[in-house]
Every structure is written in C-alpha cells, then in structure tokens.
A protein has these predicted regions:
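C-terminal scaffold of the Radical SAM
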Residues: 1-220
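Basic amphipathic alpha-helical segments that dock to polyanions
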Residues: 227-237
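Mobile late-domain/C-terminal helix-loop "cap" segments
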Residues: 220-227
Length: 237
C-alpha cells in the first residue's frame, strides 16, 4: 500500500490490475501468483491511496469457462471501484506453455464468441460502454494512451524494447539493457502508420472509420481497393 501512495503522490492517476478471474483455480491454471482475495485487497488499497481511475482485466474463454465465472469476475472488479475494464479472449500462442500443453476444457470458437457477446452485453448493462473491441469504460474514463495507438497518433516509448511513433515513423529500441544503458543501442526504423495500418486500427474502435478523416490524413478518397482490403480483414476475423 505504501507503494500505491508513493505512485499517487508522484502524480500517477491511473492504475490497472490484471485480475483475469475471480476463481483461484483458474488463476492457478494461468500461472498467476495472486488470488481473488488479493485482487479485492488491491482495489481497496488503491482507493485508500487516492486512485479514482482504476482499470481491471478480465480474461474470457478460459478452460471450462461459464457465464457464472464472468459474472463473478465482473462483480469483483466493479465492486472494487473500477472505471475501466479490459475483457479479452484467451489467445494461445504456439510457443507458449499452453501452446505446448493445451489445457483441457477449452471452448470452441463458437462457444468463445458466445462468451464474448455475453460479456459485452453485461458490461454495457453495468454502465461500461464499449469503445474498442476489448475495452469498456464509464463515460470519460476511456484509455487515452491506447486511443493514441488506434488513431495512429504520436507516442514516445522510453527504455529497452520500447516502441515509438513520431512524425508518422515507427521505431523501437532493441531489448538489450546493457547497450541501452551505455548509449550504444541505435533505434530501429519500423516503417510508419500507412493507410492499411490506419484502417485496421480504426476498425478496432466502435466509432469505426471516418472517411473524411481518412481523406484528410492520406490525401485521397477511400477506394475500392481499400474496401476489398477491409472485407478481407473481416473475413479473416
């Protein structure tokens, strides 16, 4: 709790907790070191420290997942005073522990989609408005830094492995701490936010694509080739 007070005194005004689930059995399956009780305590400590802008994460479509589990996790986070919630489906990467040894009871794609739609419905019923595929907020508490990413705005990342986008160009630093500390790590250019990147990112947002903004940014009308690209993205999920 002392750390939370120090963060708040330093000017940090938003904090996020990776709750994921209100069931300890699921947290153990995920390899998370905390318990549901500790998650509740963290929210209470953050409020005592003066945080009013608190976010919580919910992981959907876990093994043997049910609507009841989602409801329990939402209750934990909402009662903790969260103003923002990120709710996202479990994604198993091929080289991860789950990729090598998939757990039993994973939902099918259709079952996972049903869970997601149920989560969206319940979150909005509880006053968390969806503004992006996986993000929901009370009015005025949307994640400002993420909106910058999705709008292809400028952002500066500091430190090893940090990514930045400035003046329409993307760059990042290698994940070599020693090289960074000794000022021998050169930033690596990684292209820019082109029309296709912009389309993909804008389609993550509930507001969708504004054709006038698109024309102002790229100096051209939205064309049939861009429409075909968007349709291809939709067909591929």
């Amino acid at each position: 709790e002392a750390s939370l007070c120090a963060f708040r005194e330093a000017g940090i005004n938003r904090i996020s907790f990776g709750v994921q689930s209100a069931r300890d059995s699921q947290l153990k399956t995920l390899g998370r070191p905390h318990t549901a009780r500790q998650a509740r305590a963290a929210f209470a400590a953050a409020r005592r420290a003066g945080f009013e802008n608190i976010s919580g994460d919910i992981m959907l479509a876990l093994p043997h997942y049910t609507q009841a589990e989602f409801d329990e996790t939402l209750e934990l986070i909402e009662s903790g005073g969260a103003t923002h919630i990120s709710a996202y489906l479990l994604k198993i990467e091929p080289d991860s522990a789950f990729g090598r040894h998939p757990p039993e009871g994973l939902p099918s794609p259709d079952e996972a989609a049903d869970v997601y739609l149920y989560a969206v419905e319940q979150l909005e019923h509880h006053g968390y408005q969806q503004y992006e595929i996986s993000n929901f907020a009370k009015p005025g508490y949307e994640g400002k830094h993420n909106l910058i990413y999705w709008d292809c705005g400028d952002y500066l990342g500091l430190g090893p492995a940090a990514h930045s986008c400035m003046g329409g160009k993307r760059f990042y630093y290698p994940a070599d701490t020693e090289a960074f500390l000794h000022d021998t790590a050169a930033p690596v250019l990684d292209g820019g936010c082109g029309a296709e990147d912009y389309l993909i990112l804008q389609l993550r947002l509930r507001k969708g694509l504004d054709l006038a903004e698109y024309k102002a940014r790229f100096g051209k009308e939205f064309s049939t080739s861009q429409l075909a690209f968007v349709k291809n993205c939709v067909q591929n999920g």
